[in-house]
Amino acid sequence: MNKTDLANVAKQIFTVEAEELIKASARIPSDVVKAADLIQNHDGKVVVCGLGKSGLIAQKIVATFCSTGTQAVFLHAAEALHGDLGIYHPGDPTILISKSGSTDEILRLVPILREFQSPLIGIIGNSNSRLAEKVDIVLDASVSREADPLGIVPTSSTTLTLAV
């Protein structure tokens, strides 16, 4: 690939990601306000949970919360099912991140988190998913396409999840 082709691919990636962000800005503002109110009006910490690429995004969200003075911790969805739930206090809000909304490990966590009376916020790429039905607030992170020319790498979806 020559430099001109590479520059065109880069421009296309930026364009697709920007388009997806603009589309999302029209559909989620009121839900973002609900989620922000929930987090802001809670005295404890926020737990952010994901797996795979969503887990990496969750870690970045935790870092941002901590930078702004909001206590937050990352919980790996698979590790949570194997003894890492000791971080919870009753009522700690939890943000569950899943592109598909059908991640088994996260779905298995929901009833356990309900026992902790944890309000659940989902940042979900499929608002018609099983996870979307189970959380209190859905932040719709769906994208019509990824910026990756092959459509297999989560590019637009991860950018949108960070923006939410």
Briefly describe each language-model feature range.
Residues 2-41:
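An N-terminal, well-structured beta->alpha segment
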Residues 44-163:
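Glycine-rich phosphate-binding loops that contact phosphosugars or nucleotide phosphates
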